[in-house]
Amino acid sequence: MFVFIAGGGRTGAQLAAQLLDQNHQVRLIEHRRELLGLLHHEIPTEVIYEGIATDPDVLKQAGLSKANVLVACTN
């Protein structure tokens, strides 16, 4: 399954890690630089996309059109 996660806070990061452990394909979008550094230590870099999850260009680059599931973990 291909899961697209908007938001890389605690919930988004934990969800991404669990899904990756279960061999799912994951893309995570986060715009806060302070979280991006932490995320790169928790999940593979190729999963993480820097940007705002409402930006059409970021969504296209991250492959939203191929996703089976979209999870919003935002404030």
Q: How would you describe each model-predicted region?
A:
Residues 1-75:
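Cytosolic regulatory regions of ion transport systems
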